[in-house]
Amino acid sequence: MNDLDVLRVFCAGDGRYGNLLGVVRDGRTCPDDASRQALAAELGYSETVFVDDPERGVVDIRTPGTRMSFAGHPLVGLAWLLDIEELQPPVGSVWARDDGEFTWITARPEWVEDKRTCQYESVAEVEALPAPPPGEGWLYAWAWEDEAAGRVRARGFPRRPDGVIAEDEATGSAAILLTAELNRALNITQGAGSQILTAPGADGTIEVGGRVRFAQTFQ
C-alpha cells in the first residue's frame, strides 16, 4: 500500500470537523495517470494529492473522478504538512504561510472553475437544504450569519454525475470565489462545523486559511 497521510483541513477551533484530504507523499508510488485516478476513486475523499517534488512543492490534485489544476483545501493542507512557502499545482505558483494557528494560501479567483454561489435569506434555509439539492453543477449555498462581522453559514454541493461526494465539508475554492464576489474578509462556517477564513488583497488575490490536523497515517 502507498504511504498515505489523511488530514482534516479547515478544522473548527476545538480541532473537530474539517474536510478529509488524502496525501501520497511519494508520488512515484503511483507513477501514471490511471493508477492515481484509481487510488483517488478508491479512497473517495473530496481530493487526494500526490506529491511529485516535496522540496519544490510540485503536486497533482485528484477528485474521485478527475484531475484538477487548482483546489483550495488540498493546498492549505499540503502547505501545513510540507511546511513550505510555495506550492506548484498545475495552475502555477501558489504562495503559503503559517501564522501559528492557521495555514494560508494566496490564490486568484479566476483559478476557481465550474462553481457558483447562491445566497439564501437565512441560515435556517441553508441548513434545511437536502444533500444534494436538485439541479446540476457545483453549488455553494450561503447566508449571512452576521453580515456586519462578515460571518457566513455555507454548504457545498458538487452535484457531479458520479454522485460520489453528496456534500463537501469545507471548500476553499468556493470560499475564494465568494470572497471575490463580496470583496470583503469572511469567517465561514461550512458543513457540520468547519471554519474557513478569507481576506481579499489589493492586487485581486484572495487569501484563504484554516486549521489543519492529522486524521490518520497509513503505511
State what each model feature region is.
Residues 1-219:
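Active-site proximal loop and beta-alpha junction motif in alpha/beta enzyme cores
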